[in-house]
A protein has these predicted regions:
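Bacterial Sec-dependent N-terminal signal peptides
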Residues: 1-22
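Transmembrane beta-barrel domains of Gram-negative outer membranes and organellar outer membranes
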Residues: 18-251
Length: 251
């Protein structure tokens, strides 16, 4: 999560808008099993950035995020993120850390929809020439499986607590996939960022990305997701490749 911090810095720091998010993922509602841990590596490469960039080469960032999540109770987990990136010139940069507790509605409640709530908080900077800002994200996760179809909606609220870009805004996300033979899921994902609640940005300065994704259910201990996202507005990154690899370890 860093869309709000970057999108609201546009006029002063246009080059900061070049890179993709460190973590591009629509969440499912279940938490990891009690006493289990999952290690996930998020790799995102921006092939083509915002059309408003003066230099197209500024967009070619590779973002790497290590996410480690442990189940501390049956319906409660805590995740920890380490954000890093390689700039267009190949320089490695450390960008920050965040922690994310999450709770989910127990299956015993027999809700018709899956639901969970997470609060992510920590410090982040867009690159190593900028200051860290304390920021976070409140993420409501609502999902549903019906037959071979899966749907998930994350109406996220992003917030920045320090620096020149203090405020809160909304970054909605959506995913749907159709599972084939319980081995492959094909569908699409959408990611948006509208700006602050107090100042919704003009349409061309908002971020809206959508694209095809694939989920591979190769083994219960592994998580594999990949997608190619396309920008729908001038200020969106125009082409972003996202890859997620996860490995679970049980008690």
């Amino acid at each position: 999560m860093k869309k709000l911090l970057l999108i609201c810095s546009f006029y002063l720091h246009a080059e900061l808008m070049a890179q993709a998010d460190n973590e591009i993922q629509v969440y499912a509602s279940p938490t990891i099993q009690h006493k289990w841990t999952i290690f996930e590596l998020h790799s995102n490469f921006t092939f083509k950035g915002s059309k408003l960039l003066a230099n197209a080469k500024d967009a070619k960032w590779t973002n790497k995020t290590l996410e480690i999540t442990h189940g501390f109770a049956k319906n409660f987990e805590i995740g920890f993120y380490t954000f890093t990136a390689f700039s267009p010139n190949g320089k490695f940069q450390y960008l920050g850390n965040q922690i994310r507790p999450r709770i989910t509605v127990p299956e015993s409640w027999k809700w018709k929809l899956g639901a969970s709530l997470s609060l992510e908080f920590g410090f982040f900077r867009p690159n190593d020439t900028t200051d860290f800002a304390w920021q976070g994200e409140l993420r409501l996760i609502i999902d549903k499986t019906t037959g071979n179809w899966y749907f998930s909606f994350n109406p996220n609220i992003d917030f920045v607590l320090t620096g020149d870009d203090k405020g809160a805004g909304i970054s909605p996300q959506f995913k749907t996939v159709y599972t084939i033979n319980k081995k492959v899921g094909l569908g699409f994902e959408y990611y948006g960022s509208l700006g602050y609640f107090r100042h919704i940005l003009p349409g061309n300065l908002q971020e809206h990305l959508i694209g095809p994704v694939i989920d591979l259910y190769v083994h219960p201990m592994w998580e594999v997701n990949a997608g190619l996202l396309f920008g729908l507005t001038e200020n969106s990154n125009q082409r972003v490749l996202k890859i997620l690899l996860g490995r679970r370890r049980g008690k």
